[in-house]
Amino acid sequence: FEQHNPHHNLDLFNHIISVVSKVPADLELRYTALLHDIAKPLVQTFDENGVAHYKTHEIVGADMARDILTRLKLPVKLIETVEDIIKKHMVLYRDVTDKKFNKLLSEMGYDNLLRLIEHCNADNSSKNNEVVNPENDLHERLKRAVEKQMQVTVNDLALNGKDLIDMGFKGTEIGKIKGELLDKYLSEEIPNEKE
């Protein structure tokens, strides 16, 4: 399947083989690499210059991967991880702000964001290097984001359990709210203030 896009110098089959060979030997990553572009033939469109585009291939591909891996009776956690990484595998190709990066870390957790980075690095290095720069600082950004998260816990939030009780919250609601506040703070959606 020819990709008809300047970002790719390999056909789809050889691109996938290249990505699979470049990801670390991790089962979730290997399945992700194998299936990440599976929807490209279904969603391919051409612009007026004859250049192919694959909008939504990551969304359609994540659904297809989930169906395939479910039929193979693989563990649910593995299926969910592969589906999530495929769904997000185009996110890191755009300029990702620190806020968005921290939000990804909060949503995915360290292990799966690291897998996403490893996948994207293998994917990028399997493209046309005259058009795509395979160099990035994603590993360093992950390290910085983790260090930031390790420095802040729910106990460091300006709004504490007593404040929430005074607002009328009870029991397990308090822990849930504090966890949500921490996630929002770490993804820079809110400041660490009582207001």
Pin down the residues of each PLM region.
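Charged substrate- and nucleic-acid-binding regions of tRNA-handling and nucleotidyl-transfer enzymes
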Residues: 67-71, 126-195
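Conserved, hydrophobic alpha-helical core segments of structured domains
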Residues: 1-121, 131
